[in-house]
Amino acid sequence: MSSKSHRKRPLMHIQTYFRALISIAVSAGTLYLAAAILPGLYIEDPLRAFVAAIAISVANALLWPLVIRFALPVAVLTLGLAGFVINAALIWVVVNLIEGMDVTAYWVALVVAFMITLTNTIVMSLLGIDDDDFYYRNVIRRQARKHADASLSEAVPGILFLEIDGLAEPVMRRAIRDGNVPELARWLRSGSHRLEGWECDWSSQTSASQSGILHGSNEDIPAFRWFEKETGTFVVSNHPGGAAEIERRHSDGRGLLAGGGASRGNLVTGDAEHTSFTISALHARPTRGKDYYAYFANPYTVFRTFILSMLDIGRELYAAAQQIRRDVVPRVHRGIRYSLLRAVTVVILRDIAVQTVIADAYAGRPVVYSTFVGYDEVAHHSGIERYDALDVLRGIDQAFGRITHAAETADRPYRVVVLSDHGQSQGATFLSKYGTTLQELVHGACEAAVMENPFGSDEAWGQLSAAVSELVIRKGFVLERITQGHESGDAIVLGPGHELASGEGVEGVRELIKVLASGSLGLIYLDAEPGRRTLEQINATFPHLIPRLVKHKGIGFILVLSEQDGPLAIGAHGVHHLETGRIEGIDPLLPFGPNAARHVLRTSGFAHVADIMVNASFDEQTCEIGAFEELVGSHGGLGGEQMHPFVLFPSEFPWPEEPVVSAEHLHRVLVGWLHDLGHDIARVKHLERLQEEAATS
């Protein structure tokens, strides 16, 4: 046990008892007040209210874990409402068993349950008592210690990698300046941490970035979703089968999290031994559901989840209405279904991630990587620096504070690293700005059948699929009905296009031209014949297609392969010969940064690169880019802040003098930090191999 942890232990016990006494007193006072204002609730005197408060606390402690074990799926799918309803029934029974008290109707018990939760939350907040912190430091500590190693205090320090999905370095710096991330700002101002930017690959999205960061390779990941001609299948990154295939192709067994690490809420595992809510591992986990059970085992968590979910839905509906009322542009449609999806990512998945990371720290995992997806989801639909997106960012910042404070009391010492996998760029969508989709543009130029985009644009469906899949180990009647037709092996796949992503119905679209969108990046597959169609073949078959694409104002450049000149980046006013560097006319890659040619040339060598890769145009004056999907904030291609994620890390860690360009490069940096802390020899050999490969590439 670390000396710091040992010194804090007596204070924590005092805080625990104090918090329990305050909670019982507040509950008793609320019960007595409720009896005065609610018809149907009778309490003879304050003493009986105090007895009832103690009885309710004891009943929750003894009965709730058993109840929630059976009611878990319904509690999760109703955002905590079902658990709230069950606890009201518990209150109804307990109060009616005490002499001198009476509840005449269930609805009265429901109101009382709400009042007790609300007053406890308000009073604890006013007294500066963090209920979350109390729960994380006490309940989770006891659970995790059962599996912890007694020698952890002498172990090498571990690292907690906390990813904020989709947050660009410039946005992060402005958030620090403007007070939107006070916890992270405090780290920087104290000198304990420093902030650096890095540049991701052309495919500036999670599967390419996380595969590179966690496994050290993102070769042949051209976009978030792509088509493989030789097998006639679609690979969709947030589909369990697609994510598992990505990991199979890139894992060598010695990823960033190998050797006892934990992967929480990621797309790939990084070869972690412990996983939850990790899309590539959904088919393989025999213990799915235990993290949900741990989260909902505390009735306070259920009430809090329900209240926070309702508040988040309300905030979303209000923010969407305000954008319409004020005619804020750019904007996209945001309906009730999205508000429910947002509540899952912003509230439930965030808080479960906090709980599991803290449990990992108390269990002494050597390295943990967890993704927090809430900001990315809201920024897609609202905008990268709109107030509701920044509000979600503040919530993530608070969550990181809880993790850090809890980690300080863990037996193993920990270093905390906060990073992002890519940024986002903002702008009016291609459709809203030009009145047509990329699919329609290709259809008009080719005068041939084009497959309609079946996949939708919301990445959060993958996270929701992971969330529901974690429940299927406890599948019952309700889940059977809800998930019918969405099974993919042992996992559940929700959202548009799940059939094609699972390999069903592919024959029906095999011969169609396929136009796929990945934010500001488009992929055009002109046929299903294996191999890439060349510029000369395209011009012979579809003579109007290339001219129509490059002359469109919404398209910055296209990538094609010429039989004579090799890979070419072609824009409206010039051509960039990628192998030789020769420029004809105006370089179409000029607005996309000094490393654009390097990124595009590398992608051109991928086995599954599309016949035509299309990058949206970037306005250097307004820093705007138009997505080929209906997203205000987007990523996936070149242009603007989507290419510039960040790393916030302990000042004692070294940072390369040269720019960090590519997720694979960042992987080498992170592995180097583990090496410097003294992690296992296999990782050291892995780092040496990576450095040799980088030097010869």
Please annotate each region the language model reported.
Residues T231, N238-D252, G260, R264-D271, ...:
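Active-site neighborhoods of enzymes that stabilize oxyanions during catalysis
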Residues R174-S211, G216-D220:
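Short, structured active-site-proximal loop/turn typified by the sulfatase FGly-forming signature C/S-X-P-X-R
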Residues S2-V111, T121-D131:
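Juxtamembrane/disordered regions of integral membrane proteins
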Residues S153-R173, I213, V367-V373, L393-I396, ...:
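Beta-strand elements within well-structured catalytic alpha/beta cores of enzymes
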Residues D132-S192, S432-K433:
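Active-site-proximal N-terminal segment of extracellular/periplasmic enzymes that hydrolyze or transfer
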Residues D397-G435, P567-I570, V575:
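Metal-dependent active-site segment of extracytoplasmic phospho-/sulfohydrolases and closely related
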Residues V347-I348, Y375-V416, E440-V450, P543-H544:
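A long, amphipathic alpha-helix that forms part
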Residues F134, G216-G383, G519-L526, G531-R532, ...:
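His/Asp/Glu-rich, glycine-adjacent segments
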